[in-house]
Amino acid sequence: MNMNRKLKTLVAMLGAAGLGLVATQAQAQDKVKIGFITDMSSLYADVEGKNGALAIQMAIDDFGGKVLGKPIELLSADHQNKADIAASKAREWIDTQGLTLLFGGTQSGTALAMAEIAKEKKRVFFDSGAGSSALTNDQCSPYTVHYAYDTVALAKGTGSAVVKQGGKSWFFLTADYAFGAALEADTARVVKENGGTVVGSVKHPLNASDFSSFLLQAQNSKAQVLGLANAGGDLINSIKAAKEFGITKSMKLVGLLVFITDVHSLGLKNTEGLLLTTSWDWNLNDQTRAFGKKFFEKAKRMPTDIQAADYSATMNYLKAVQA
């Protein structure tokens, strides 16, 4: 789908959801306010965090800093990976700041909580960082736009490819919250549909400090593939531990959600041969390389696919409102 068609689709969607009122809201206020709530300080801070806010601000600046003649202001906050904090901040901004657009970042539990607030308050909610397919399936809303990727896409991209390459039997190491559960379930379904089997799984707490007991269970399963249904710091630490305990001698590691920042943290020695799916890469073509260079000049690192999605979603939203 080309960019013009995407923009037309977004404009139609905004109108269908009764969100043509966004333009009216923007005109009635002195500023158009965008609120961005994500993990700024914990295990997902590198994959989005402050540089996600930077990407959104870059889009605002590239758009000209105004929409419908009104200046655009970006608010940002750290949800600390807690759904109640995310929901409370979203409600506060809508009630006291006249927020026009709510932007949700990493961590599916927080995203689902913000989606409920957006639905209640009739505000557009963009999510580019959280992956749970619940956002577009059983907890979908006409006000939620799930941007960039979800667990269904990750499962189909990586799960089917690994099975076709001979990885028939799987064991999952899964983060114990909405995203991990969805990623395991969606990938398990794809594995089975392609003739593979799931021999077991084990859940670990979010931001776990010790993976040894979980990895021992995985090793004892005798599965060919260890599917990592986690992300960020948890993915990094589980891969390091798997290498340390020699898990990779008997099992193929499959990262079901891996970011460029994870690769940088782990180094090529730990990520060599790792299979993964990504929604975007800075080195894909001339356009992505140009954006990557511009982002690097400000952040001193290349953008993750989530940070690129933050930019893209903001730009498309502003174009839709202006239209």
List the model feature ranges, each with a label.
Residues 88, 133-134, 141-245, 280-290:
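Extracellular/periplasmic Venus flytrap/periplasmic-binding protein
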Residues 26-37, 65-73, 163-168:
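Immediate post-signal peptide segment of exported/extracytoplasmic ligand-binding proteins
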Residues 35-57, 77-84, 106-107, 173-181, ...:
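Extracytoplasmic "Venus flytrap"
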Residues 222, 316-323:
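Extracellular/periplasmic bilobal clamshell ligand-binding domains
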Residues 239-313, 321-322:
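Extracellular/periplasmic periplasmic-binding protein-like sensory domains
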Residues 47-52, 62, 66-138, 147, ...:
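Beta-alpha junction/loop-to-helix N-cap segments that form part of ligand/metal-binding clefts
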Residues 93, 97-106, 126-128, 169-174, ...:
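Periplasmic-binding protein-like
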Residues 2-27:
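Gram-negative bacterial Sec-dependent N-terminal signal peptides
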